[in-house]
Amino acid sequence: INAVMAGCRPEFLPVVIAALETICTDEFNMHAVLATTMSVGPIFVVNGPITLDIGMNSGINVLGHGNRANSTIGRAVQLVIHNVGGGGPGGVDRSTLGHMGKQGFCFSENEFSSPWPSLAESRGYNSSQNVITAFTGEGPRLVMDQKSRKPDSLIRTLAEHLISTTSSRVVVGMDAMLVLSPEHAARFHEAGWSKERFLEEITEMMMIDVDNIIAGSNGIEEGLPAAMKGMTLPKFRPDGLFLVQAGG
């Protein structure tokens, strides 16, 4: 019923069901996603042949409107959360500002024209399998770099933006999803970078000198305890940066 109300075609239903099965796990913890006061929501990335079969968008305006499959799959999941799970604002949902992902946020990766492994392949699946990844995210936020033509420059821009995720003073206890556009991805592909090299180098660039983010430093009360001075910590958890290629 909720899928019909969202405008899904019958062939979208396997993806809707897979998305619901994914978030209804202890590992994902949908209750925590709703109950937090933070502005986050579930994001779904779909990989595999089904993305072509049902006409999902992985290209121009991939995170926006205009594609029935992308829009209605995400919306159907949110209607189930609200109508079946009781996850409405002011009830279970306690977000201070909310998140547009709670209207519906689903897209496919542009995996068929990239030399790099897809998100699903990086997670241990093969290209013939249909896979959905559920991720709790804020944003999205734009990373603008119109001048870098070499990967060594562009990756520094990306790292600089990623460090500010949630707050530049929050480290280790979070993940992030980086959606790399074709133009930016091409800088790395043409230079012969592998996905593994990209992730290794950007992770190294996001090692944080804790002395700069101790509570009270630079007149900011937010930060880490003084007992952690002298430490160097990663911005994200190990394997906590999810790299997706999409857009036009």
PLM region spans:
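Non-transmembrane, aqueous-exposed alpha-helical and coiled segments at domain scale
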Residues: 1-248
